[in-house]
């Protein structure tokens, strides 16, 4: 049996459960439970994705969330020397996220959810502050929006049509 290149890449992805919620509906025979899960997938080298899923069983919700996360992978190419190239402030619904580059040896200074996202993205040195909403989904969306808005020095020079020696 041979593995394709695509499935080999999929095997390198690590999956983490960010949030699990249990909802209950009261029916004639008692309570009926359903679950939702927010799942994060990454390889620590710039590939990252998140997925949200609902199901009647917890394991099904986690499995479906992982599948959704693998379908929505993004690639962050502007990670220079383990940090981000510039500061970024992002608004997503009610959540605000501030990411600042840090010197080598600083580590990841951030809240637990944002720290997990940045670790799985492969960022080594960064300072992050989450402002506003504490809703996990909004914080995850804000983090992804911030990471996608990063541009390297080379990209900025190309946009400005400036040559650099």
UniProtKB/Swiss-Prot annotation:
Its GO CC terms? small ribosomal subunit
One Pfam assignment = Ribosomal_S5
Cysteine-cysteine disulfides: none
Tell me yes or no: is Ribonucleoprotein among this UniProt entry's keywords: yes
**Residues of the signal sequence?**
none
Q: Indicate yes or no for the key word Ribonucleoprotein.
A: yes
User: Which residue windows are transmembrane per the record?
Assistant: none
BP GO terms, sorted = translation
Family matches, as PROSITE patterns? RIBOSOMAL_S5, S5_DSRBD
Family per similarity comment = Belongs to the universal ribosomal protein uS5 family.
Give the comment on domains.
The N-terminal domain interacts with the head of the 30S subunit; the C-terminal domain interacts with the body and contacts protein S4. The interaction surface between S4 and S5 is involved in control of translational fidelity.
Biological role: With S4 and S12 plays an important role in translational accuracy. Located at the back of the 30S subunit body where it stabilizes the conformation of the head with respect to the body.
> What quaternary structure, including any partners, is listed in this protein's UniProt entry?
Part of the 30S ribosomal subunit. Contacts proteins S4 and S8.
UniProt protein name: Small ribosomal subunit protein uS5
| Organism this protein belongs to | Chlamydia caviae (strain ATCC VR-813 / DSM 19441 / 03DC25 / GPIC) (Chlamydophila caviae)
Q: Which gene underlies this protein?
A: rpsE
């Amino acid at each position: 049996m041979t593995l394709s290149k695509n499935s080999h890449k999929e095997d390198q992805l690590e999956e983490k459960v960010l949030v699990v919620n249990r909802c209950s509906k009261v029916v004639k025979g008692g309570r009926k439970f359903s679950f939702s899960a927010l799942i994060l997938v990454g390889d620590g080298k710039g590939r990252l994705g998140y997925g949200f899923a609902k199901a009647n069983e917890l394991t099904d919700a986690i499995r479906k969330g992982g599948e959704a996360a693998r379908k929505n992978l993004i690639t962050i190419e502007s990670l220079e020397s383990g940090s981000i190239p510039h500061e970024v402030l992002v608004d997503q619904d009610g959540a605000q996220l501030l990411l600042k580059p840090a010197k080598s040896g600083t580590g990841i200074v951030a809240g637990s959810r944002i720290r997990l996202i940045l670790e799985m993205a492969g960022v080594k040195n960064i300072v992050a502050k989450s402002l506003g909403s504490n809703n996990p989904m909004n914080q995850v969306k804000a983090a992804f929006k911030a990471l996608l808005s990063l541009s390297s020095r080379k990209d900025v020079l190309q946009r400005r049509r400036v040559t650099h020696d």
